From Swiss-Prot:
Mitochondrial intermembrane compartment spans: 37-76
Protein name: MICOS complex subunit Mic10
Keyword Transmembrane attributed: yes
Keyword Mitochondrion: yes
UniProt cross-references to InterPro entries, sorted A to Z: Mic10
Quaternary structure (record): Component of the mitochondrial contact site and cristae organizing system (MICOS) complex, composed of at least MICOS10/MIC10, CHCHD3/MIC19, CHCHD6/MIC25, APOOL/MIC27, IMMT/MIC60, APOO/MIC23/MIC26 and MICOS13/MIC13. This complex was also known under the names MINOS or MitOS complex. The MICOS complex associates with mitochondrial outer membrane proteins SAMM50, MTX1 and MTX2 (together described as components of the mitochondrial outer membrane sorting assembly machinery (SAM) complex) and DNAJC11, mitochondrial inner membrane protein TMEM11 and with HSPA9.
Signal peptide residues on this chain, from the entry's feature table: none
Sites bearing N-acetylserine, chain numbering: 2
Membrane-related topology note: Single-pass membrane protein
Localisation: Mitochondrion inner membrane
Length: 76
């Protein structure tokens, strides 16, 4: 494994976490405004689900060291 691979994986994990956090927060806001009378718990729930999904994806990326974005990488 080269030195740049973990850096790329961390960058991908952080970008994925920001996207999923923002999406979860946005969906929580929509549900909060439309169904739950402006309560705060849908925001926290949506954000938590997004972060949990991002954590799971990052964990999977770091557990499979020879798989990089769907391509098998041969060790030299």
């Amino acid at each position: 494994m080269s030195e740049s691979e973990p850096g790329r994986k961390w960058d991908r994990c952080m970008a994925d976490a920001l996207v999923k956090l923002g999406t979860g927060f946005g969906l929580g806001m929509v549900f909060s405004l439309t169904f739950f009378k402006r309560r705060k718990w849908p925001l926290a729930f949506g954000s938590g689900v997004g972060l949990g999904m991002a954590y799971s994806n990052c964990q999977h990326d770091f557990q499979a060291p020879y798989l990089l974005h769907g391509k098998y990488v041969k060790e030299q």
